[in-house]
C-alpha cells in the first residue's frame, strides 16, 4: 500500500518573458507638486485638473479649457514662437496664461484621461496637437510639422506636433488622452507598432517611422493597406485606447480662411 503524499501547494504563475506590455497610467492623482504649483486630478469619465499657484510660477493653456478659477488669479497672453506659421495652418497663434496665487481648474469637452509628465532640465517631449491641457511657465514651448506617415493619413502637408522642453528649470505638462492612456518604456533598439491615431506623446529619443502592410487575398487581389507608426527606443511612448485621427492641416487652413481672424480663435 502506497504512502499518501502531502498535497502540493499551487505554483504561482510564471511571469511572461520578453518585452513588457504598455502599462496603465494613474487615472487619479490626489496630490502632486512641481516648483511653484500643487495639483490634483479627479473624476473618471471627464476628469478635471486642479492647479494651485503660489504666485511664483504661471501656467499656460489653450483658452477654451478653463473650467473655473479663483477671481484673484490674473489672466493674460502667453506669447509663442512661430505665430505666422500657426496662423497659416489654422492653429491658435497665442495661448492664455494664469498667474496666482490661487486655484484654477481645467477640463476638455470629451471623455478621457488627464495625466502629468514631469520634465527635468535637459528633457523634452513631443505631443500630438490638441492633446495638451496646461503646462508650467518654466517650460519652453515650440512645435514641428509631422510629415511622412502624416502625408498618407492627414493630407499632403501633415500635422503639427507640440514640443515641451525643460531648458533650465523643472516643469510639468498635463495632457489629455482619449480613452485611457498607457505608457511603454522602450529599451535601446526595442520597437513597438502603434495605430497612427493611438499615440499621444513620445520622448525625443524615440524615433517614429511609418510601417505599411499591403493586404492581399487570393480571390480579390489587393485589399488595401494597414498602416502603423513604428517607434524605436530608447524612451517613453504614450498610447491612448481611443483612436484619434486629426483633420488634415489643409482642412485647418480652409477653416482659418473662412474666418476674418484666421486661426486666432480656432481650437
Set out the residue ranges of the language-model regions.
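Composition-driven recognition of glycine/serine/threonine/acidic- and proline-rich low-complexity segments
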Residues: 2-267
